[in-house]
């Protein structure tokens, strides 16, 4: 998504922008895209009554009839009957028609509608990583009878599901390894850090609630030595650790 929006940040740069910022700092344009997709995976994001105000802020789309129309369509499709993927494709096309300047909004709503239709407790970011830019451009032009976009959307979700399943298997294996190593840890905040590493993509080795900065660094060095986590940056300073 960052690249589609003309940004140059890769995964490592986005991770650094998010996890190394201070509370209240602007994570930058790329970091704001990451923020929108982190919000997608939160349980609170499922509440359609908050979509208009939250999406306006997340995607920097001004309030107006266009955004209202898209959100109303999404809320309607979220509780409808029929194919979940077809509903996701429909809301994405509607979003690109009404708010053509914001492709990420269309993909966010597609995943959200899909999650509602499938009765998931929260949404998962799926289509954005698999949809092709050319197919996305066609979506805003697709008519009601056009089959190009629905098929492209279905294929993207099929690829996304396979990729998500592979990632799940890998993360479960890595999380199990961390949990096996956890009883061997003796540092302050060790239990808290293990919980954070299970829940978050990355964690800086900074001071915790009771542990010093030095103690925290030793904890992460121990976890790396045990093969429980990886150092993700390759830098000697401002390091990040994760599964």
Predicted regions and their residues:
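FIC/Doc superfamily catalytic core
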Residues: 1-243
């Amino acid at each position: 998504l960052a690249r589609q929006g003309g940004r140059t940040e890769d995964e490592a740069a986005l991770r650094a922008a998010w996890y190394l910022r201070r509370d209240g700092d602007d994570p930058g344009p790329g970091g704001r895209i990451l923020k929108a997709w982190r919000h997608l995976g939160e349980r609170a994001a499922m509440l359609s009554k908050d979509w208009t105000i939250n999406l306006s802020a997340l995607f920097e789309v001004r309030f107006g009839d266009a955004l209202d129309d898209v959100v109303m369509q999404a809320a309607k499709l979220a509780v409808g009957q029929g194919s979940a993927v077809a509903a996701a494709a429909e809301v994405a096309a509607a979003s690109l028609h009404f708010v053509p300047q914001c492709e990420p909004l269309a993909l966010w709503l597609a995943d959200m509608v899909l999650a509602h239709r499938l009765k998931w407790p929260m949404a998962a970011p799926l289509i954005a990583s698999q949809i092709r830019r050319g197919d996305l451009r066609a979506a805003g032009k697709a008519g009601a009878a056009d089959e190009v976009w629905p098929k492209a959307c279905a294929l993207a979700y099929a690829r996304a599901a396979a990729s998500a399943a592979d990632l799940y298997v890998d993360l479960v294996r890595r999380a199990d390894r961390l949990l096996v190593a956890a009883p061997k840890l003796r540092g302050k905040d060790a239990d808290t850090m293990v919980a954070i590493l299970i829940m978050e993509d990355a964690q800086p080795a900074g001071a915790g609630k009771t542990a010093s900065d030095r103690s925290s660094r030793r904890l992460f060095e121990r976890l790396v030595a045990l093969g429980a986590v990886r150092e993700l940056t390759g830098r000697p300073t401002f390091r990040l650790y994760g599964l």
